[in-house]
Amino acid sequence: MFLEKIVQVRREKVRQAKNKIPFWEMRKMAEEQVSHRLPLSLRQALLRENAKGKVGVIAEIKKASPSKGVLREQLDPEEVAQVYAKSGAAAISVLTEEDYFLGSPEYLKAVRAVVSLPILRKDFILDPYQIYEAKVLGADAVLLITSLLASVELKEMIKITEGLGMEALVEAHSLEEVEKALTAGARLIGINNRDLRTFATNIDVSLKLAPVLKEAGVVMVSESGIRSKEDIKALMTAGYHGILIGEALVRAPDPGKALEVLLA
């Protein structure tokens, strides 16, 4: 399966990264960052928008995807991040996976230098090394995908993330995965409307799982396949605090205008 291929490539990239900067050194650098910069809370950023009667938008910087290919030929991460910030984004998501999404850890570093919004590292995180690296790059939150991690790994990675002053956006696609996320201690859960095995999207996935998340009292985010104001209204009515949008923005001629239209 394609997902397995991405995971295999990612594991190899992490192995190569550890050869350049050993695990202990990356961890030390990350721990030093804790006292150097106060992290920004993704959860609080979303809830602040809700207090104004709006949904919190995590606007994504994404050059390509395995299913759609290149989404934006000329992508300047710093410019797009600044446009998102001016256009009402609550937070910025930066894809750092290089081979299939044409992202880069350097994108995150560059974005950190130009915006004061919370930044989410979006990647296939399989090893604590990547969490320490995210901290060093300037991330405030990391995406942890439930289906890629054993329960014990997920719990440990949430603990490491929070120990560094960051937050974990724990991604799920089914009731079973939501329960796994809750058991691991997730307080911020993202429902991916995209099936990572087929890449098909349907916001009904988020709508069906909303009651379980509401009952658990977590901050709720809906990810992928959100294209219209009607979609946003349905998700807000269901109780979602935030939405993650990438493709609909980066494919637009003017990403900032596209975001403003969705939020109007």
Swiss-Prot record:
Cited NCBIfam families: PRK00278.2-4
Which species? Carboxydothermus hydrogenoformans (strain ATCC BAA-161 / DSM 6008 / Z-2901)
Return the similarity comment: Belongs to the TrpC family.
Q: What class of enzyme is it?
A: lyase
One example of a Gene Ontology biological process annotation: L-tryptophan biosynthetic process
- Entry keyword Amino-acid biosynthesis: yes
E.C. designation(s) = 4.1.1.48
Q: In which pathway does it act?
A: Amino-acid biosynthesis; L-tryptophan biosynthesis; L-tryptophan from chorismate: step 4/5
Keywords associated with the record? Amino-acid biosynthesis, Aromatic amino acid biosynthesis, Decarboxylase, Lyase, Tryptophan biosynthesis
Task: Kindly give the PANTHER family that the UniProt entry links to this protein.
Answer: INDOLE-3-GLYCEROL-PHOSPHATE SYNTHASE, TRYPTOPHAN BIOSYNTHESIS PROTEIN
| Catalytic reactions on record | 1-(2-carboxyphenylamino)-1-deoxy-D-ribulose 5-phosphate + H(+) = (1S,2R)-1-C-(indol-3-yl)glycerol 3-phosphate + CO2 + H2O
For this entry, the protein name equals Indole-3-glycerol phosphate synthase
Stretches of the chain forming a coiled coil according to its record: none
Q: Does the keyword Amino-acid biosynthesis apply?
A: yes
Any one GO MF term held by the record is: phosphoribosylanthranilate isomerase activity
- InterPro entries referenced in this protein's UniProt entry, alphabetically: Aldolase_TIM, Indole-3-glycerol_P_synth, Indole-3-glycerol_P_synth_dom, Indole-3-GlycerolPSynthase_CS, RibuloseP-bd_barrel
Reading the lineage from the top rank, the first entry is: Bacteria
